[in-house]
UniProtKB/Swiss-Prot annotation:
GO terms for cellular component: cytoplasm. This is UPF0235 protein VV1_1522. Pfam families: DUF167 (PF02594). Disulfide bonds: none annotated. NCBIfam families: DUF167 family protein (TIGR00251), PRK05090.1 (NF003466). Belongs to the UPF0235 family. It comes from Vibrio vulnificus (strain CMCP6).
């Protein structure tokens, strides 16, 4: 099985499955070998990606410019890198 979340130096890399247009922003848990995250933004004109980077920045206590979508810009399956996070959410720590 592939890794869901791992450390790469001082960065955290996450494999995500995104559920857009949800009623609230939340980490839902594991979805196969990915971490499922519900976001309120619709998957239109990059709004979901923008919302995701802002949300991950908030959860990891970094600027949104330090959150990079490495793979999956146009799909629900994404690989995201958070550069030098100041905090790691408990849901992520549990599977790290």
């Amino acid at each position: 099985m592939s890794q869901t979340v791992w450390l790469d130096g001082e960065d955290v890399v996450l494999r995500l499955y995104i559920q857009p247009k949800a009623s609230r922003d939340k980490i839902l848990g594991l979805h196969g070998d990915e971490l499922k995250i519900a976001i309120t933004a619709p998957p239109v004109d990059g709004k979901a990606n923008g919302h995701l980077t802002k949300l991950l920045g908030k959860w990891f206590k970094v600027a949104k410019s330090l959150v990079t979508i490495e793979k999956g810009e146009l799909g629900r399956h994404k690989q995201v890198r958070v550069h030098t996070p100041q905090q790691i959410p408990d849901e992520v720590k549990a599977i790290l």
